[in-house]
């Protein structure tokens, strides 16, 4: 009898878990959203599409849900940049990937890098993007100071090679490293 009850409880738990998972996936992107096509930046060989990031509004701020592949595992700096371009641009005689995106979006002229919830930092500062060991990224990121989709339209979404310490020290702009992937927010 105990085995039957345990088996029944296990089966019910599995069904409930599957239902909850499917229910969450079905309602993940309800309502208004922005889909941002993201490309791995390579000015020499041409950019390669690696997926998308879906941006939605929530009661807690904008949610950035990545559906990306072919990235290096680990944490990456993740920001909204000023200009709606992912093009390479020349700087000091060298072609720099994604430089046409400009700097971090800073409409309040804070003039410094910081945490996504800091009132005295760029509005474009997002939480770091976590990339799984298999090179995929699918964990949502919440930007609590950004409330409306219209606020980010006409900008670009940038992924940097390294992590982000959310400070200008010891390295400027969180020490995130070169621009690795980008998408224009339309």
UniProtKB/Swiss-Prot annotation:
Subunit structure: Homodimer.
Residues that hold Cu cation according to the record: 79, 81, 104, 160
Protein name: Superoxide dismutase [Cu-Zn]
Binding site for Zn(2+): 104, 113, 122, 125
One Gene Ontology cellular component annotation held by this UniProt entry: periplasmic space
Predominant location: periplasm
Pfam families associated with the record: Sod_Cu
Physiological role: Destroys radicals which are normally produced within the cells and which are toxic to biological systems.
Signal peptide: 1-20
CDD domains for this protein: Cu-Zn_Superoxide_Dismutase
EC number: 1.15.1.1
S-S bridge residues: 86-182
Cofactor: Cu cation; Zn(2+)
Subcellular location: Periplasm
PROSITE patterns: SOD_CU_ZN_1 (PS00087), SOD_CU_ZN_2 (PS00332)
Listed SUPFAM superfamilies: Cu,Zn superoxide dismutase-like
Organism of this sequence: Pasteurella multocida (strain Pm70)
Family as reported in the entry's similarity comment: Belongs to the Cu-Zn superoxide dismutase family.
Domain of life, source organism: Bacteria
Any GO molecular function: superoxide dismutase activity
């Amino acid at each position: 009898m105990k085995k039957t009850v345990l088996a029944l409880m296990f089966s019910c738990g599995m069904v409930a878990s599957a239902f909850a998972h499917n229910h969450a996936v079905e309602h993940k992107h309800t309502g208004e959203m922005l889909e941002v096509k993201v490309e791995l930046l390579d000015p020499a060989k041409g950019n390669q599409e690696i997926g998308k990031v879906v941006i939605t509004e929530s009661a807690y701020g904008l949610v950035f849900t990545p559906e990306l592949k072919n990235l290096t595992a680990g944490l990456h700096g993740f920001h909204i940049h000023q200009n709606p371009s992912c093009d390479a641009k020349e700087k000091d005689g060298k072609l720099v990937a994604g430089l046409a995106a400009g700097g971090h979006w800073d409409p309040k002229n804070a003039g410094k890098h910081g945490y996504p919830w800091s009132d005295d930092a760029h509005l474009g500062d997002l939480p770091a993007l976590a990339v799984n060991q298999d090179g995929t990224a699918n964990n949502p990121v919440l930007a609590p100071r950004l409330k409306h989709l219209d606020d980010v339209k006409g900008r670009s979404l940038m992924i940097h090679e390294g992590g982000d310490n959310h400070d200008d020290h010891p390295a400027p702009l969180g020490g995130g490293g070169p621009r690795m992937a980008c998408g224009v927010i339309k």
